[in-house]
Structure formats: structure tokens, C-alpha cells
From Swiss-Prot:
A lipid is attached at C205, C207 (S-palmitoyl cysteine). Thiredoxin domain-containing protein that participates in various redox reactions through the reversible oxidation of its active center dithiol to a disulfide and catalyze dithiol-disulfide exchange reactions. Acts as a key inhibitor of the alternative triglyceride biosynthesis pathway by inhibiting the activity of TMEM68/DIESL at the endoplasmic reticulum, thereby restricting accumulation of triacylglycerol. The alternative triglyceride biosynthesis pathway mediates formation of triacylglycerol from diacylglycerol and membrane phospholipids. Residues 217-226 have a biased composition (Polar residues). This is Thioredoxin-related transmembrane protein 1. The active site is at C56 (nucleophile), C59 (nucleophile). The chain crosses the membrane at residues 182-202. It comes from Mus musculus.
């Protein structure tokens, strides 16, 4: 029995030691992990999000404070999350992460960047005292859910895909670097041609070109408002034409009279000369 009692003492000490070690007894992790697939859950409720990288020393120093702050999440009615920018490049593009670690506060779809001290106490006061109201929210044009940031996210993901493909071509397939560049150049030209054809097809469907019809002469229909002035103008033109025709007729009559008188005079002058010769 004495020998058994001696064995129980070290065993009990070992159990207590393991229980005292953080995480050894299945400690719950209250920090949620966000990805490109589930990030839309940020648009509902109140959130505190940390953007970090495993290789960042400042991010490593922040982790204990962030996990301690996450334990107060249920009491503060705030959800605490983190994003690994090395794996979730799309999210880093949506938020335009330029420094690590970066912390954002989100309340019902409004995003604000946290710029205060990075301790558990400061995080708690920031949420409980609603200090986030003193910070101007990010414009909807540059919000993570905007069209512009969606395109930025796609651009970040495309850059990672190109880099991964280049590494696969060079290291796994043994293609020279210049050969990989030629592949990407050909793919770029081909995608540009396909995109141009698609745009032309869409434009033709939305705005079809009208076929030109042969021009036909149609009778002009005038409104009653302009019919009376037009009639007056036509009557004046007809009157002017009549005046001109009358003047021309008078001139012709005068000319004919003059010619007849001159011919009579010539005859009268010619008669005595004939008698004299007789």
C-alpha cells in the first residue's frame, strides 16, 4: 500500500500540471476563421477582424491578446475573427491590406479601420464604449462588397494563379522561363480576342444596326398652323408672276406698234419716189 501511495502522488501532480497548461484540456478557441467563401457573414452583426500573416513578428505578438479578447466576445456581443492573408488573397484584395497586422471593425455592413493600441483592454473598451462611432466608415465605393473591390479581389486571385502556374511550368514540367512567358502571352492575346468578340456580340444584340431602306418621296403634310402663311406666300408669288406677265405683254405690244409704225413710214416715203420715176 505504501508503494502504491508513492506512485499516486507523482501521477496526481502530473494530472494537475496538464490541467494547468493552456489548451491541454481542450480549451475552446473563440476566434473565427474567415475565408473567401464565408466572408459575407461579416455583413450581419458586429465583428472585429484581424488580418495577419504567420511569418509576421508583430502578428505573432498580437495573437495572445487577440485570443484573450475573443473570450469576451459573447459578453460584448461581438464576433472576433482573423484572416490569413497568405491563404486568402482575395480578402486581402477586398480590404486592400498594406500593413500587418490590420484590424477592422464591422457593424451591419459598415467597415472601419481600428488604429488604436493593440491590447485586450483597449479592444474591449473600443467595443463596449462604442468608440468606433468616432471613426469615419469606409466609403461604399471602396467597401469590401462593392463592385470595385470585387474586381480588385479577382485581380489578386488572378495574380496568385499566374504565379502558381508559372512555378508549375518551370519546376514541375521543366519548361524554360521564356517558354512560360510565351504561354501567358498567347493566353492573354487569345482571351483578349474572345472578350472582344463577346463584347461585339453583346453590343449587336443590344443595339442592332438598322437596315437602310430606299428613299421614297412622300407628300409633305403641313399642319394647319403653317398652311395659311404658305397660302399667302403662294398667292403673293402668283400675283408677282401675273404682274410680270402683264408687263411683258405691254412691252411686246409696244414693240409691235413701233415696228408697224416704222413700216408704214417706210411705205409712205417709198410712194412719191415711184411716181416721180413715172
Amino acid at each position: 500500500m505504501a508503494h502504491l501511495g508513492r506512485l499516486m502522488v507523482p501521477l496526481a501532480a502530473l494530472v494537475l500540471l496538464l490541467w494547468a497548461v493552456p489548451g491541454a484540456h481542450g480549451r475552446r478557441n473563440n476566434v473565427r476563421v474567415l475565408t473567401d467563401e464565408n466572408w459575407t457573414s461579416l455583413l450581419e452583426g458586429e465583428w472585429m477582424i484581424e488580418f495577419y500573416a504567420p511569418w509576421c513578428p508583430a502578428c505573432q505578438n498580437l495573437q495572445p491578446e487577440w485570443e484573450s479578447f475573443a473570450e469576451w466576445g459573447e459578453d460584448l456581443e461581438v464576433k472576433v475573427a482573423k484572416v490569413d492573408v497568405t491563404e486568402q488573397t482575395g480578402l486581402s484584395g477586398r480590404f486592400i491590406i498594406t500593413a500587418l497586422p490590420s484590424i477592422y471593425h464591422c457593424k451591419d455592413g459598415e467597415f472601419r479601420r481600428y488604429v488604436g493600441p493593440r491590447t485586450k483592454k483597449d479592444f474591449i473598451n473600443f467595443v463596449s464604449d462604442k468608440e468606433w462611432k468616432n471613426i469615419e466608415p469606409i466609403s461604399s465605393w471602396f467597401g469590401p462588397s462593392s463592385v470595385l473591390m470585387t474586381m480588385m479581389s479577382a485581380l489578386f486571385q488572378l495574380s496568385v494563379y499566374i504565379r502558381t502556374s508559372h512555378s508549375y511550368f518551370v519546376h514541375d514540367l521543366g519548361i524554360p522561363a521564356w517558354g512560360s512567358y510565351l504561354v501567358f502571352a498567347f493566353a492573354t492575346v487569345l482571351s483578349g480576342l474572345l472578350l472582344g468578340l463577346c463584347m461585339i456580340f453583346v453590343a449587336d444584340c443590344l443595339c442592332p444596326s438598322k437596315r437602310r431602306k430606299p428613299q421614297q418621296q412622300y407628300a409633305k403634310k403641313t399642319s394647319p398652323e403653317f398652311s395659311q402663311p404658305l397660302k399667302k406666300v403662294e398667292e403673293e408669288q402668283e400675283a408677282d408672276e401675273e404682274d410680270v406677265s402683264e408687263e411683258e405683254a405691254e412691252d411686246r405690244e409696244g414693240a409691235s406698234k413701233a415696228t408697224s409704225q416704222s413700216s408704214i413710214r417706210q411705205r409712205c416715203v417709198g410712194l412719191p419716189s415711184a411716181t416721180d420715176t413715172s
